[in-house]
Amino acid sequence: GESYDCEIAVERVLEGVQGLINKSQGFNIDKILFCIGNDILHIDNVYGQTTKGTHQDTDGKWWEHYEIALMLYVKCVEMLRYIAPVDVIHSMSNHDYQSGFHLAHTLKSWFRKADDVRFDISVAHRKYYVYGENFIGLEHGDGAKMDNLPLLMAQEQPEMWAKTKYRYFYLHHIHHKVKHKWLDAKDYIGVTVEYMRSPSSADSWHSRKGF
């Protein structure tokens, strides 16, 4: 299979962040939403298992993963805050439910004196964010069914829904990319629900399944 380790993972993330920064040049960027979580640690205990006990292929030790992920997040936030103030939102994930939560809080502590970095790292499974007329929902993708997300969005945050025109829900649970479109009863307000692809290579399970 494809060669992949922590060093390659870090390189891909930093390359992706720098690529987005490069593409944003020429625009008046006044706010950046940085989404973290989504199984970055991949495992949730010292035995190389997920929160529910499923063994995973990993490179290195559990504590190395934590240290590497923390410093990667710090580097990303530092890169982004040079451009504009950063809002960090953490998505609770099924592989590293507890350790990912701890990692997010450690990152918040790192930037505790930074007035240009804000955090939403609660245990809530779905997080919501408004920028101008844009309403953004975030979830790992292992919770509510995809078909239910648009109505959940309206029900859970009616005020945010009412004051926005453009609505998006981003999920991260699968490797391949899927996009659906929902319209309200009058067919004029759209909600786009999209799965974002992982920058990681497929492990043995995903490789066998063809992801």
Question: Language model features by range: what are they?
Answer:
Residues 107-118, 123, 132-137, 142-211:
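Conserved beta-sheet core of the metallophosphoesterase superfamily
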Residues 2-117:
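Core catalytic region of metal-dependent phosphoesterases/phosphodiesterases
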Residues 1-5, 171-174:
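Short N-terminal secondary-structure initiator segments
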